[in-house]
Amino acid sequence: MAADSTPGSHHRNLFFQYGKAAIHRYHRLHLYGKAFIWLVILFYIAFGVFVIIVTPARIAQFLYDQAKLLAATRFGWVALLLSIICISFPPLIGHTTLVTLCGFAYGMKGFYIAFAGSILGSALVFVVLRFLFTEKIRSWSAQNEKWQALEAVVRSKGLPLIVLIRVSPFPPWVYANSLFASIEPVKLWQFVAATCFITPKLLLYVFMGSKMAALSDGDQRDRMDTHDKIINGLFLAGSLVIAVFTSWLVYNLVQNHIRHLHGVDPETDELAAEAIEDFDEDAPLLSPTASHRV
């Protein structure tokens, strides 16, 4: 019995729980969803083989050269900003990659591009989806208990709760935009204000991009002594660890907060938390089967 209470046992149990949940979700996917997952796996295997054959140094140098070419282009920043706006629309992905590219190509000045693109893109998604699917949202929420609970909680707690959900890493960027557009009590100004709170995350990814650029260029690497290379590598690794840890921490804090809101029925809390966890299956603007059930 004592062994079951050790930290190692707790982590193993947590790992198995997440594993079972992932397998359960996989089995519930449509055939196309399963095929997509396997295509992604094959892509990463092929990408890994490609990196090994071409070598990371040559790939990094090529990417650095292209990034600097983009930065030297007169309207390169406009292209990057428009790209961030475009990938804010579902089902496109790549927000984190493009934000990191802002730092890779422009250094810390790239933060302004990342911030402007993120704010404009998310606001545009919110307005377009809300305008096009208002009736669908109302019809869906009228017959979905989890969604009613989520809307009730958001309506009750307002902007502070919207901010907490927005800074959470789950749901991911593009799906979070759709999620908030699906929650009728959320106003545009609240959504934009909450999105401004992702500034620290944007700064972190832009910083990581700037450090990756310094280590990718062969000329810069040659001018660095061992100490500088280690420092840059530690900065990059530390930033990655911070990003992963804070994402995990914030998500768990948000879920715990939603489940223990003061002045809200515990059952409503639980249903609201489940609505966020199952966003890909239940959200009226995300689920491929939603249109058939509304």
Swiss-Prot record:
<feature type="transmembrane region" description="Helical">
    <location>
        <begin position="75"/>
        <end position="95"/>
    </location>
</feature>
<feature type="topological domain" description="Lumenal">
    <location>
        <begin position="96"/>
        <end position="112"/>
    </location>
</feature>
<protein>
    <recommendedName>
        <fullName>Golgi apparatus membrane protein TVP38</fullName>
    </recommendedName>
</protein>
<feature type="topological domain" description="Cytoplasmic">
    <location>
        <begin position="134"/>
        <end position="187"/>
    </location>
</feature>
<dbReference type="GO" id="GO:0016192">
    <property type="term" value="P:vesicle-mediated transport"/>
</dbReference>
<keyword id="KW-0472">Membrane</keyword>
<feature type="transmembrane region" description="Helical">
    <location>
        <begin position="188"/>
        <end position="208"/>
    </location>
</feature>
<feature type="topological domain" description="Cytoplasmic">
    <location>
        <begin position="251"/>
        <end position="294"/>
    </location>
</feature>
<dbReference type="GO" id="GO:0000022">
    <property type="term" value="P:mitotic spindle elongation"/>
</dbReference>
<feature type="transmembrane region" description="Helical">
    <location>
        <begin position="230"/>
        <end position="250"/>
    </location>
</feature>
<feature type="topological domain" description="Lumenal">
    <location>
        <begin position="209"/>
        <end position="229"/>
    </location>
</feature>
<dbReference type="InterPro" id="IPR032816">
    <property type="entry name" value="VTT_dom"/>
</dbReference>
<dbReference type="GO" id="GO:0000139">
    <property type="term" value="C:Golgi membrane"/>
</dbReference>
<feature type="transmembrane region" description="Helical">
    <location>
        <begin position="35"/>
        <end position="55"/>
    </location>
</feature>
<comment type="similarity">
    <text>Belongs to the TVP38/TMEM64 family.</text>
</comment>
<comment type="function">
    <text>Golgi membrane protein involved in vesicular trafficking and spindle migration.</text>
</comment>
<keyword id="KW-1133">Transmembrane helix</keyword>
<dbReference type="Pfam" id="PF09335">
    <property type="entry name" value="VTT_dom"/>
</dbReference>
<feature type="transmembrane region" description="Helical">
    <location>
        <begin position="113"/>
        <end position="133"/>
    </location>
</feature>
<keyword id="KW-0812">Transmembrane</keyword>
<feature type="topological domain" description="Cytoplasmic">
    <location>
        <begin position="56"/>
        <end position="74"/>
    </location>
</feature>
<feature type="topological domain" description="Lumenal">
    <location>
        <begin position="1"/>
        <end position="34"/>
    </location>
</feature>
<keyword id="KW-0333">Golgi apparatus</keyword>
<feature type="region of interest" description="VTT domain">
    <location>
        <begin position="103"/>
        <end position="212"/>
    </location>
</feature>
<dbReference type="InterPro" id="IPR051076">
    <property type="entry name" value="Golgi_membrane_TVP38/TMEM64"/>
</dbReference>
